């Protein structure tokens, strides 16, 4: 019996991939922080094929710290160091439900800065472990603020207490810092416009601190783009004037109106439930093989709703900012038992 050497047929696209890999040799970074930003944009053709929309997802999970918050953390701290407001003998203290804390912890680890992250009991054990792995200290708030019932307000009170107790304390204050929105004015939205053109019809952004929303909206306005901004907020969030309510998933929505917010930032506001986020995330991973965080599922559900309502029309082009990676939600969004316990036994049959 003669054994013949099998012929090799290069799979479609592999040649381009290899050429891109060779070209990337000239783009070697000098540090992990230089890898923040310039995230890829991919066509979500399978998920939105029937709607006739051209939807493009910006994969912020591919930032080195795993989320879009890497941009803000890096921008805030580098500007603070450059201005002299932050020095290496300072202790940085910040409130975060997870992603911004991770972004800060990464920057601080590289720059040799001390960091205390104030989190609450909704922060996942995985996120806490990541923050601590970078060398930051975690301060856990276990009870909500008695006046507002919000964990965010309790975290902010704890931040102020710690700042009063440490010498040379520095509070980045992601909810009010112009260098938060400046990160997206200077990188996120320009990257979208460069890749997809200034005539993109919609940009869809999940809200929390309103840094991404503010930066993208201000850029669109200042550049005279006709792009409409869609803000996707969580039900129970107070950002757009709705009453406060229970929210199970961290990092989406807010229990206060951030200083970065302006009433005219969004052309369209869509409120999504925790279940909308869960189902949207699962459709995204099942159809596009993108394992994304909770707010990305909310964006998927919001686009589907706007398409069904005729707000987004066939042929229009949509940029969806997918803020973070899904591994941090395996015990919640992607856990059948958690979903059934928190959202009802029939939640996954919808």
Question: Which residue stretches match the model-derived regions?
Answer:
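PLP-dependent amino-acid enzyme catalytic core
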Residues: 1-350
